[in-house]
Curated annotation (Swiss-Prot):
The gene is pyrB. This is Aspartate carbamoyltransferase catalytic subunit. GO terms for cellular component: cytosol. The lineage of its organism: Bacteria, Pseudomonadati, Pseudomonadota, Betaproteobacteria, Nitrosomonadales. Heterododecamer (2C3:3R2) of six catalytic PyrB chains organized as two trimers (C3), and six regulatory PyrI chains organized as three dimers (R2). Belongs to the aspartate/ornithine carbamoyltransferase superfamily. ATCase family. It comes from Thiobacillus denitrificans (strain ATCC 25259 / T1). GO terms for molecular function: amino acid binding; aspartate carbamoyltransferase activity. InterPro entries: Asp/Orn_carbamoyltranf_P-bd, Asp/Orn_carbamoylTrfase, Asp/Orn_carbamoylTrfase_sf, Asp_carbamoyltransf, Asp_carbamoyltransf_Asp/Orn-bd. One of its GO terms (biological process) is 'de novo' pyrimidine nucleobase biosynthetic process. It holds the Pfam family OTCace_N. HAMAP family: Asp_carb_tr. Keywords: Pyrimidine biosynthesis, Transferase. It catalyses: carbamoyl phosphate + L-aspartate = N-carbamoyl-L-aspartate + phosphate + H(+). L-aspartate binds at residues 92, 177, 232.
Amino acid sequence: MNPQLTPDGRLRHLLTLDGLPRATLTHILDTAESFMDVGEREVKKVPLLRGKSIFNLFFEPSTRTRTTFEIAAKRLSADVVNLNIATSSQTKGEAILDTVDNLSAMHADMFIVRHSQSGAAHFIARHVAPHISVVNAGDGRHAHPTQGLLDMFTIRRFKGEFHNLTVAIVGDVLHSRVARSQIHALTTLGVPEVRVIGPKTLLPTGVEQLGVKVFHDMAAGLAGCDVVIMLRLQNERMKGARLPSAQEYFKFFGLTPEKLALAKPDAIVMHPGPMNRGVEIASEVADGPQSVILPQVTYGIAVRMAVMALLAGGAST
């Protein structure tokens, strides 16, 4: 049984997309669609989470993810508490579980957790009270499920269906928790061909076992693609130099207008952010007509609203 689901199939935690059935992913995306108009209203709120307390526990820096979770929770009328790690008892050596236990004693209903250690969100989920839900907002290299979901939502909005697409994920797959979540979601939702493109040093050993095709050449990898997802170099997770220089990387694996022309004419370009312009993507592409990078950010609010609403409301998946 999947620990993220209750015995009757309801979402209890969101820790990873690996192992979640297609019906669950589709239901989250459908629920997100129903929240898309909230941001366009004069009063950008719905009362679904009124009286609920949501704690953002970000042990790693974040701009888009933390902010969109906060906006999403407030649009659901929840009370949001952002824990400032720099001034918290964590800096005094308090164990993460003690931090969580103390916050639980303050009648928390949900924890949004980002941590540098893979498995941190799973660890917390195993120790919280039954009424508390945990959302993994990124744990080490392991997973970033809400980013994976908002990327699927973006693809569905621009491409309609998944069953006839070729999707390429380009760059530092080895250190990317986003890539792992994207691959699990794409294969679960029925994308027939998922490609990863990058230098051998930045692709995990045995990545083919996840059901992807591997390319070390941009021209071959981008040919005929409907969706191109660029990843940044995760310099903060690298142990020692793996590349000669950022300029060298851009030469071979940076997405330029010339390289994008190898994909289908109506291909869309995505990036989970933050972008390193001139390293993995040229500004002409990032700001160009095929880029859907800013819509990704907008859609992230609706997707995170959907996740929190399903967790707190217990809507069947």
